Amino acid sequence: MKKSSLKRIAAFLCAVACAGSFLLAGCSSSGGASSGGADSGESSSAPAASVDLTSGPEVDLTFWHSMGGTNAKALQTMIDEFNTKNKGHIKVTAQFQGNYDDAINKFKSAMVSKSGPDIFQSYELGTRYLIDSGFTDPMQNYIDRDKWDVKQIDANIAAYYTVNGKLYSMPFNSSTPLLYYNKDAFKAAGLDPEKPPKTLEEIISLAPKLTQKDASGNATQSAIGMWAYGWFLDESLNKMKKPSFDNGNGRTGAPAKVAFDSNGGGAAYLKAYHQLVESGAMPKYAIDADNARSAFVNGKVTMYVESTAVLASLLKAINGKFELGTAYFPGVDDKVSTGGVSIGGASLWMMKSDDARKQAAKWEFIKFMVSPKGQAFWNTKTGYFPITTEAYNEPVFKENVKKYPQFQTAINQLHDSSPESAGALCAIYTQVRKIEETEMQKMLNNQQTEDQALKNMTDQINSALEDYNASNAK
């Protein structure tokens, strides 16, 4: 989920250049909320039954987002389409707020001064905070009012943003981690390029065949690059069907402490991840995100773990130098890693307000953004999953998957998971991830043992949770 994000394309989708105006249907006006309301409480009262936005002044909405580059262009295309369809009734203005961490920090400050956005795109790490903040108006209020069919959202995607049966935000740009691999390197090593490894244990066993050295004994090609990312720890716990935190993984209540220390999941992942470096399967430089990507693109490592959302940009960067393969996110081993993955990425949040016209306008915009045609367009331009299942039936989506079959792996992995793999919620998740990543890096650099890394993670995260819960007790 990271954060940040996922990530983009040009060559990936020349096939859909003709999709510039995707003419989304069923998005007429109806509207309203005040810019950045600061009401307290988990949810607002039931929204007004109906609001006619075809009369009265145009409703202006401010939309804060964290999309850059190609993603930002695709986003603006969608917004322009919406504004054209609703001219004179609703106008949405997009404002880039930097990466996800920057955006949520700005959001916290702005909402206190009542100068925040009407609609806010935030990463999955911000979910628990935004639910608890009292600033947001749950999507479930509008779903229930309009009897909007929530089943049109992929269940495995909706699960992350659903707590106690209530969908709080609308999934928008969703992704999961994948194993990317160099099929040509597999062939050269005498390995079947259609049978990629499924676990870290298997990757370690294959590493000698994928390793090449120069006359001095230095590795010129290694097996894998997998950076020290807290998301990969979380996903490994999901694959093991073990929670990251107590209190239902942060879903039945605010987490008070981590669970990965006592359930064995943390130790299992740290041992397997550390062994990648210790065995020589992964060069130490490849524990860095940029280095891991560069090494893979340039043939210095044969496998690379990253988000599904980088598929497009990888294809562009590789530019035909080798055939790119995709596989499911690797578990620790085939004995414990029998579960699925949860989604990362971001969702759309509606701010609370007493202005019924603004609330209705926000709801219309959000429905537009997740319509089948809109999500098919968004997928082909960015590489994020379509969150709406009907988007899979759109011609532009089918054409794209046919041209880039690697993306089918991401779809299959998502559908082979289950809502039970929804993932954890934590109001200080960004801080948690930083602690995890710092301690993993120290372990990989031989500054501490696996046991010390696990203890340091546990102690620091539990202390941070205690401080947060004490200062936010209701």
What are these model-derived regions, one by one?
Residues A46-L53, E124-L178, I204-L206, D234-M240, ...:
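Hinge/lid segment of periplasmic solute-binding proteins
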Residues E81, K85-I153, K187-G190, K195-K198, ...:
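Extracytoplasmic "Venus flytrap"/periplasmic binding protein-like
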Residues V163-F172, P177, K187, E201-K257:
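Extracytoplasmic/periplasmic solute-binding protein
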Residues T84, G88-K91, A189, K271, ...:
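Extracytoplasmic/periplasmic substrate-recognition and gating elements
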Residues S109-A110, D118, D149-F186, Q221-S222, ...:
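A structural signal for short loop-to-beta-strand junctions that line the ligand-binding cleft
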Residues S205-P208, R251-Y285:
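Glycine-centered hinge/linker elements that transmit conformational signals in sensory
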